[in-house]
């Protein structure tokens, strides 16, 4: 069996952990880097079902950190203690690739591979396409088609969009750096974000946190396959449903 630290070295080379935001907790979340692992599982999020199905001595690589904020208590009856208990009992290690991976891989996948936009410029966590000059309705139609969804929550502040900005996951707060006639495509848009953006003449399209990042596991699997690691992809449905 291989060691966790060997995979950490590969992942750090491709997406340095030092690139993560100061508030993030990417890296080894559970286990020891000197632990041996039996197989690798990649997933966007560690759900209770994924934890229960995880093989003994597995290494799980996840996008969202299981331990995000400092824990004052570890209660195995509530999240994340309920999942941590299962993982520890199975000797499962967990590596998180969060905002560092957003910057190096996932944002590009969201904007280019998934939504098919090119000519993108990096600006912090955002990718920006200047002088896109696209009609808002056509933009929404294109994104719905790319994501395979029938509806999207939007703020339409202008009919013609000059500049586009992309932030996978939860990036609605970043619209403040944009100019009027821009449109930010991201997830987790809140009511007050929408109100403020509208007052500034900035449009928003909520592509949802789930849909903007669901390609994570496949990207990681393809990367590790090139280093001769076999990876099992664990997918799950968006927990938020429109009924």
Curated annotation (Swiss-Prot):
Pathway connected to this protein: Cofactor biosynthesis; 7,8-dihydroneopterin triphosphate biosynthesis; 7,8-dihydroneopterin triphosphate from GTP: step 1/1
InterPro entries membership: DUF34/NIF3, DUF34/NIF3_sf
Catalytic activity: GTP + H2O = 7,8-dihydroneopterin 3'-triphosphate + formate + H(+)
Keywords, ordered alphabetically: GTP-binding, Hydrolase, Metal-binding, Nucleotide-binding
A family per Pfam: DUF34_NIF3
Temperature sensitivity of activity: Optimum temperature is about 35 degrees Celsius. Activity strongly decreases above this value.
Binding of a divalent metal cation 2, residues: 64, 209, 213
pH sensitivity of activity: Optimum pH is about 4.0. Activity strongly decreases above this value.
Binding site for a divalent metal cation 1: 63, 102, 213
MF terms (GO), sorted A to Z: GTP binding; GTP cyclohydrolase I activity; metal ion binding
Gene3D superfamilies documented for this protein: NIF3 (NGG1p interacting factor 3)-like
Gene Ontology terms: cellular component: cytoplasm
EC number: 3.5.4.16
Subunit structure: Homohexamer.
PANTHER family: GTP CYCLOHYDROLASE 1 TYPE 2 HOMOLOG, NGG1 INTERACTING FACTOR 3
Membership in a protein family: Belongs to the GTP cyclohydrolase I type 2/NIF3 family.
Listed name of the protein: GTP cyclohydrolase 1 type 2
């Amino acid at each position: 069996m291989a060691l966790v630290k060997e995979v950490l070295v590969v992942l750090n080379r491709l997406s340095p952990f030092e690139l993560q935001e100061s508030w993030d907790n990417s890296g080894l979340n559970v286990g020891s880097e000197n632990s041996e692992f039996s197989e690798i599982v990649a997933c966007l999020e560690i759900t209770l079902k994924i934890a229960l199905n995880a093989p003994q001595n597995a290494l799980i690589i996840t996008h969202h950190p299981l331990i995000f904020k400092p824990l004052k208590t570890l209660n195995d009856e509530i999240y994340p203690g309920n999942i941590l208990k299962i993982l520890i009992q199975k000797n499962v290690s967990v590596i998180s690739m969060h905002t560092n991976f957003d910057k190096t891989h996932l944002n590009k996948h969201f904007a280019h591979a998934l939504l098919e936009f090119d000519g993108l410029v990096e600006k912090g966590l955002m990718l920006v396409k200047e002088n896109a000059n696209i009609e808002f309705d056509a933009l929404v139609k294109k994104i719905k088609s790319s994501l395979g969804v029938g509806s999207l929550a939007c703020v339409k502040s202008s009919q013609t969009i000059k500049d586009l900005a992309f932030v996978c996951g939860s990036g609605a707060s970043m619209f403040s750096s944009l100019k009027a006639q821009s449109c930010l495509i991201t997830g987790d848009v809140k009511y007050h974000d929408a109100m403020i953006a509208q007052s500034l003449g900035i449009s928003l399209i909520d592509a949802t946190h789930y849909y903007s990042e669901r390609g994570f596991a496949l990207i990681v699997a393809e990367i590790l396959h090139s280093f001769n690691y076999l990876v099992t992809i664990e997918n799950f449905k968006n927990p938020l449903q429109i009924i």
